[in-house]
Amino acid sequence: MSSFLIARSRGVDMIALPVFPSRRLFQTELSYHVDSGITKPEELADKRLGVAEYQQTAALWIRGILEHDFGVSQYKIHWYMERSEEMSHGAATGFKPPAGISFNRIAPNKSLASTLLENELDVAHVASPWVLRANALDRSSRIAGKGDWNKIKPLFPDRMAEGARFYKQHGFLPVNHTYIIRGDIYRKCPWVAFNLYTGFVKAKALAREQLLERIPTALFFAPEYAAMTREMIGDDPFPYGVKANKVMLDAIIAFSHEQGLTPRKMTVEELFAQSTLDL
């Protein structure tokens, strides 16, 4: 979503659907090294914080939440980025660190996990430095590092409590991704946006009906956790549409501009297909 905002602010010919298949409470995935002296998020000023990529959506939400909810300015943190200049979203957008930001790159033979374990970072966006998903860009799954794993702790020991706090305060869960239509296709076939949106809405409804049936049976208390989640954030934690996501969209647009990723605040009319704006 962040790279899409950047691209649209530069006039890239594409349009989005208000369909958000992935949401995460990114701040709850931060881990810290106990030797950093950190005990709570308000103490991150002057600390070294590592993210996979500076411009990506996860890092945007982390910066915005740390600043607006915990009073830690992005300018008070020393930022470290794992992905290389070539292997990153920034390679496509021509990313340059915003003025005034303390920005550093992690050495190519190291990773977020290894630098955190070896106390070269105080905090990193890795929920578990020793259990990481492999992908084509991030190195932590291949370079786990050496160190005492017992010294790595979650910044938010009770992730569910922090999630409940955030949702109660803001009324939404942060989005990660959306779906994009090329501008030439949208102009040639404008009906495709509404039809795709309708299809995604129906698919989500079918998936939710079968949710508990698809949870592995090894997760013995899945129904109880599903009930807890429903009590915390309601029946639909993944709402689609512009109207249902207005507060969230206003927040991510504002964060992008505040953080110097976009030169101005975008409008939803610039971002989403016309036929979906009233949905």
Label every model-predicted segment.
Residues 1-89, 94:
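Short, glycine-/small- and polar/acidic-enriched structural segments
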Residues 2, 89-212:
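Pocket-lining segment of extracytoplasmic ligand-binding domains
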Residues 39, 77-114, 267-278:
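Short helix-initiation/N-cap motifs at beta->coil->alpha
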Residues 46, 174-178, 235-237:
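Short, solvent-exposed beta-strand edge segments and adjacent coil->beta transition regions
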Residues 50-54, 58, 104, 240, ...:
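Conserved aromatic-histidine-acidic binding/catalytic patches
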Residues 180, 185-258:
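Secondary-structure end/capping motifs
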Residues 247-279:
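Tryptophan-rich aromatic "cage" segments
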